[in-house]
Amino acid sequence: MSSDQEMAIFGEAAPYLRKSEKERIEAQNKPFDAKTSVFVAEPKESFVKGTVQSREGGKVTVKTEAGATLTVKEDQVFPMNPPKFDKIEDMAMMTHLHEPAVLYNLKERYAAWMIYTYSGLFCVTVNPYKWLPVYNAEVVTAYRGKKRQEAPPHIFSISDNAYQFMLTDRENQSILITGESGAGKTVNTKRVIQYFATIAVTGEKKKEEPTPGKMQGTLEDQIISANPLLEAFGNAKTVRNDNSSRFGKFIRIHFGTTGKLASADIETYLLEKSRVTFQLKAERSYHIFYQIMSNKKPELIEMLLITTNPYDYAFVSQGEITVPSIDDQEELMATDSAIEILGFTSDERVSIYKLTGAVMHYGNLKFKQKQREEQAEPDGTEVADKAAYLQGLNSADLLKALCYPRVKVGNEFVTKGQTVQQVYNAVGALAKAVYDKMFLWMVTRINQQLDTKQPRQYFIGVLDIAGFEIFDFNSLEQLCINFTNEKLQQFFNHHMFVLEQEEYKKEGIEWEFIDFGMDLAACIELIEKPMGIFSILEEECMFPKATDTSFKNKLYEQHLGKSNNFQKPKPAKGKAEAHFSLIHYAGTVDYNITGWLDKNKDPLNETVVGLYQKSSVKTLAFLFAERQSSEEGGTKKGGKKKGSSFQTVSALFRENLNKLMTNLRSTHPHFVRCIIPNETKTPGAMEHELVLHQLRCNGVLEGIRICRKGFPSRILYADFKQRYKVLNASAIPEGQFIDSKKASEKLLGSIDIDHTQYKFGHTKVFFKAGLLGTLEEMRDEKLAQLITRTQAMCRGFLMRVEFRKMMERRESIFCIQYNIRAFMNVKHWPWMKLYFKIKPLLKSAETEKEMANMKEEFEKTKEDLAKSEAKRKELEEKMVALMQEKNDLQLQVQAEADGLADAEERCDQLIKTKIQLEAKIKEVTERAEDEEEINAELTAKKRKLEDECSELKKDIDDLELTLAKVEKEKHATENKVKNLTEEMAGLDENIAKLTKEKKALQEAHQQTLDDLQAEEDKVNTLTKAKTKLEQQVDDLEGSLEQEKKLRMDLERAKRKLEGDLKLAQESTMDIENDKQQLDEKLKKKEFEMSNLQSKIEDEQALAMQLQKKIKELQARTEELEEEIEAERASRAKAEKQRSDLSRELEEISERLEEAGGATSAQIEMNKKREAEFQKMRRDLEEATLQHEATAAALRKKHADSVAELGEQIDNLQRVKQKLEKEKSELKMEIDDLASNMETVSKAKGNLEKMCRTLEDQLSEVKTKEEEHQRLINELSAQKARLQTESGEFSRQLDEKEALVSQLSRGKQAFTQQIEELKRQLEEETKAKSALAHAVQSSRHDCDLLREQYEEEQEAKAELQRAMSKANSEVAQWRTKYETDAIQRTEELEEAKKKLAQRLQDAEEHVEAVNAKCASLEKTKQRLQNEVEDLMLDVERSNAACAALDKKQRNFDKILAEWKHKYEETQAELEASQKESRSLSTELFKVKNAYEESLDQLETLKRENKNLQQEISDLTEQIAEGGKHIHELEKVKKQIEQEKSELQAALEEAEASLEHEEGKILRIQLELNQVKSEIDRKIAEKDEEIDQMKRNHIRVVESMQSTLDAEIRSRNDALRIKKKMEGDLNEMEIQLNHANRQATEAIRNLRNTQGVLKDTQLHLDDAIRGQDDLKEQLAMVERRANLMQAEIEELRASLEQTERSRRVAEQELLDASERVQLLHTQNTSLINTKKKLETDISQIQGEMEDIVQEARNAEEKAKKAITDAAMMAEELKKEQDTSAHLERMKKNMEQTVKDLQHRLDEAEQLALKGGKKQIQKLEARVRELENEVENEQKRNVEAVKGLRKHERRVKELTYQTEEDRKNVLRLQDLVDKLQSKVKAYKRQAEEAEEQSNVNLSKFRKLQHELEEAEERADIAESQVNKLRVKSREVHTKVISEE
């Protein structure tokens, strides 16, 4: 758990991601009782927290936090997790895992706005319904490169893990973001894309030329900008989501080999086209329509000829028009900006807006029906003109094509007339097609823009698809969306539960298969299997006369009662009609099939499509360019069938879905589950039951369980050994081949981890959750230790090199000082002055010759430099040519790779085509069989129909006879149905009425009127029955003819299908042959791959052996270093003795110098013997020069050999330098003492004794030198042994290279080689530039030395020799560099030839490999990656061996040179000893002078010591200052180090005192001042030695003051740094205090917000309740008003009827005066009518009693209806019949009105026309009276039938009550048994967990014991080794002493 400081990198997002330290501490200290703290089931909240009060008899009494007391069963109580698990980030870590624990953890995190939570292997996110600051740039940076356990849960963490897995595992990844609609999938998708665009940013603009209208955005900008554009055209507001994606998309983000963005592409699925023309009330259309009308860009309003009011356009105003959470104006600007960034041209942009506006105008097109025709015609042309203008069409042509489309009939085209409804349907279809095609075209354009043509290796796919939807009205779009989610959930279940456990079984891991019950195959097969829903739908679309009803009937026949997931929906009042129900994983959905056939066929007006193809708007013409109209099809293809190109929407959808699932299966998936917290979109509120339902459906708990029980992490053995062997390399034995599995077992066994947390499979090692992260942390720590140790060794080596250089400079300074002192002593001698004058004259000729030679050399040097420049230019040109060749080869390799990829794609396409053809063949075969069966059935039916036709002709007369009987039965049935309908209407009205009395009166009145109306309607119904039956007979004859025609069509279709079948079979045979060839190739490739695998294993074994030998060599090197350390100690003693001797000799020399100037007699004697001394001095000087040259060579060789032999040779060189220095000092002292030999003979005797002692010491040194020689011989023997081993290694390496060369000729290996050669060329160029710089510096230095020589040739003869020496060294350097340059150019030429040969081989090999690897790309990539890793190891081992070989050769060369120089030095040392013995007699003479000058020597010695101490202190301080400045200037270190080394070499040649240039600039300036002071003192010939000393002291003091100032400034800087660090700490403390205060304030604010939220929730509940009451009251009032209005209408109609009756009676009375008979008949009719009214009133009373009884039995009837399926079916049928009768009733009412009208006319005619009309009316009245009597009889029969049904309902009710009681008893028994089973399971699981814990503890203790024993053994062995080494060291020390 991270601290608050570590969380500070997340900025303001930290509180929303992880609990603070204070909260964690409070949670840990919170009181908690694990036995009583529980969750308890509760009806309202599902689960609540509580405390156990008591447990008795399987019942638990719990007191909830709200204070309520509940008594529940044991299985309804769940233990609570300790407080430290509150708001836990990974729910798989919980102690108690159950539904309430998961629910409350999500709820508490959601309340704290921590919306992301891990759930085992996947992530759960809850929609916050508000903006949170958790997606800022600093959050993206904080999550980059973090492991999952290192950072809080977040979508960025999932994304980064996928990114890292892609890079390390070399496998494509996918992120599946799923959830219901409105759960937040789209937002998370955008965040994933934002993360990848940020971390894998390329930062490079597109390389194509900028074109007008294009913004040059980077690839990441374009990827991010694709979302706003797609959301504007593809997202809309739905009931559950304000920004719902109405299409699915799969975004693939491609990455290059380095992990940078390469390109991207988008695949879309099933845009919801119907939303363009239709929306529900609470929804709206796509955002782009409302963005355009937001008036943010007024120029769009003018261009599109629209207004800003959405209600002006029918297509977009059927639902809501505004969304509170969306600002359409801002979204329009974002959409417009995205169009520009994505590179759409200005014409394309304008056409997009124009087509969108045209769709809006389509909704306003009006059509009307022509008079006296069904033909439609335009109702105005203004809207059509606007739409046609925007689409680049002629409005007249458009209207003509809509109203009079051309249709192909046979081989001719005819003009077809359209009804108004057909025209509206065609307009809607065209609008949807234009919008859909435009959307798909935009996606294609986006993909073209995102395809950068850069090389890409892997991709990460992000899936965002419409969530699961359950609406009131669910159509074909909802079925497709829900089916997609069903498939994705099945993919998740299969991946998480099935594949996981199957892999355990396959790998041989002990595992008991767990069935989680999450298989969704039944529902998926129901939809997509043959004869499933989609199959039936597509089959129906093939038949021209299929309807929605026939489709529904087929669904019922195939699936109703046969599949548990297919059900018949139950009717619900207030909801849309549903035809079938499916049980999905997320719930039961009712589907309405209305219009599915048209949606699936997606028909278009071909005439209008032809106009589109000729449009002046290029985009519109392009959209429909590929669609051929019926006219073009007829002209181009003749009579060819169009079924071959016919593809339904469902088929296209299934094809895309199968592609998606194939893509997902080929990737490594990462799941993100989005959860809806509530249905009201309220931030912070969580509905328990809703969340639990989603958790159960998504398999969250099951995923956590399998994560805890299973082994989610697994690695191949070879990969594990390669990656983690660094944890304990000693566990894997070196030098012998060991299997990767055994190596992994040993490695894991040697690591301190819980061994129950992993299992070994056949090919992989499996880990429990979290263990792999622990191993990664251990590996990181180990690598950090190794790197730290390596850095320490490198720093130590560099500092030792620096120290050696400092010591060399110190010794050079001492030498120069000594020479200057000696020169200052002799320069005032007269003879010396004479010598100075004569010497140049003698050597002037030689000097001129030397100058001439130098000029010649200079000219040669210039020529050589010109030649080297020319060669350099040639090499640069060659390098350019090589680079060009390299680029050409890379292009060729890329082209070959593209060709390979194309071949693979073609192969994949062929395989897919084969699979599709096989499926089509199967479908065609099945369809042919079905057609044959149908044909046989039709043939039989034809025969039957022919027979039946003859029988029908005979039976027509019988039917006419039985017609009356049928009519009676029909009327009886209708009466029964009508009575049941009236009963249901009464029941419905009973629910709605306000008071019983008012409702009863209204029903009675209305029922009376309805009965009267119905009685009149039935009269007309009976008259039309006969005509209907006759029409049915005619229809049967017509259907017979149609069946004949259909049979003919089927026979033609059968012949065509047989032809297609033959073609398909032939293509199948070809495909089978191709398949066999591919199988043979595949077998060959597998054999080749097995051979390659064996070779790779051999290579691994050789690599292991080489690594073992390298380690042995390293151990031997360590032993040599230990011996060198011992030798170093002995050398320190010798050095101490040499320092003592040098000090004594210096004292002697100083005394002798003082004694030399004591007396004039001694000076005279010196003059006499000056000649002898000069000769001796020349000899000594020559010897000294030889020794100095030898010392310089030894120092150089010593510096070269230090890298291999370490401190041993360094000490030896230091001894040699001390001896040479002593020799030179002794010779100089002998020179000075020779002039005083006669006067100090006594002192010589004493000095002779001292020389004897020195000889003894030299003999000791000689013995030590012999020991060194012996050591060198041993090293030579060791070198020979190493040489033989190196030869063996080289032979093995040659064999290895021969084997590896076959594998290393791939594209990537050659690319690495070319880059290596390029780097070598750059290094050569740098070396040449350094050489040129060195030559130029040497020329400059030669000029300087020449000037010094001309100026001071009288006083500096010795410096002249030094200059000549420097020139010779420069020449050596030059010749060396020239030879090296020539050699390197030859090597470069050779390398170029090798490279050309290798490139040629590579081309051949690449061609061969490309030809071989078409179908094995994925396997090839994996093996190639493994080979690359092996190649890296081989190259490293080759490089190491080559370096060892090179070092060995250098070592041999150095040893030989060292041996030769040592022999020469030994000879010179012997000569010096002889010379020293010859001069020892003379040394006795100076003994007295030595004694006399002892006091002066002591004083000089003290001064010398002080000066030396000061110089050493200054040197150390300078070194410290150099280190400090070196640390400050790390960037310049390498360049200036090379420069300083060359400069130091040249400065040593010219005897300067400068330090390295560029390292210490300030100290270099001071040393230059010192040099100028020394030069000036040399030029001043008359200055005394004392003045020189004072000058030195002044220089030292100035250096000291400068150094003190430097130290003070450094101390000030350190003090300021400490002060700043203190201030920073104080600021951090203040910041922590401020953060704590802020967190407290935020917590108080959250508490206040929580209280406010609770208050707001209560207030919202109260307001909702009040609103519900108001709605109910308003509904009741509306119903009352409607009823009152109906009553008023009925009263008005009654009054009108009464008036008309009175008028008719008056007219009849008038007519009766003229015709008495008619009057009497009318009177009898009125009496009969009154009698009928009394009878009807009696019947009405009886009906009221029946209705009252039905009301009393209402509740029982409802239960009976729900429980009895057959009764429900009866009621459904009766309801359908009732609806049909209701329509008939309305028709009859219209008929009654017509009859009434006719009656009035008849009466008028009767008044006018005479007796015939009256007689007809009298006959009609008699018929009516007969019909009324018949109707009365039917009513009586209906009453009897109703009573029978009531008895049946009562019986069913009693039976249902008994069944319900039995079910309850059985349910109680089942619950008890289940509770017992759960208790037993829980006890077993607890016991198992306890045993596992004990077993793990035992294994851990056993492992620790074994490790302790191993450590004890190792420590004991180390102690023994140390003892042996200490004894050896002790014996060596004793022997040396």
From Swiss-Prot:
Composition bias, Basic and acidic residues: 1126-1154
Alphabetical UniProt keywords: Actin-binding, ATP-binding, Calmodulin-binding, Coiled coil, Cytoplasm, Methylation, Motor protein, Muscle protein, Myosin, Nucleotide-binding, Phosphoprotein, Thick filament
Domain IQ: 783-812
Residues with Pros-methylhistidine modification: H755
Region of interest: Disordered: 1116-1164
Record carries keyword Nucleotide-binding: yes
InterPro entries associated with the record: Kinesin_motor_dom_sf (IPR036961), Myosin_head_motor_dom-like (IPR001609), Myosin_N (IPR004009), Myosin_S1_N (IPR008989), Myosin_tail (IPR002928), P-loop_NTPase (IPR027417), XRCC4-like_C (IPR014751)
Modified residues (Phosphoserine): 1090, 1094, 1160, 1235, 1241, 1259, 1276, 1286, 1290, 1301, 1304, 1472, 1493, 1512, 1540, 1552, 1572, 1598, 1601, 1712, 1724, 1737
UniProt modified residues of type Phosphothreonine: T64, T69, T419, T774, T1239, T1253, T1263, T1284, T1465, T1499, T1515, T1728, T1734
SUPFAM superfamilies given in the database record: Myosin rod fragments, P-loop containing nucleoside triphosphate hydrolases, Tropomyosin
Family annotation (PROSITE patterns): IQ (PS50096), MYOSIN_MOTOR (PS51456), SH3_LIKE (PS51844)
Family: Belongs to the TRAFAC class myosin-kinesin ATPase superfamily. Myosin family.
Record's protein name: Myosin-4
Lineage: Eukaryota, Metazoa, Chordata, Craniata, Vertebrata
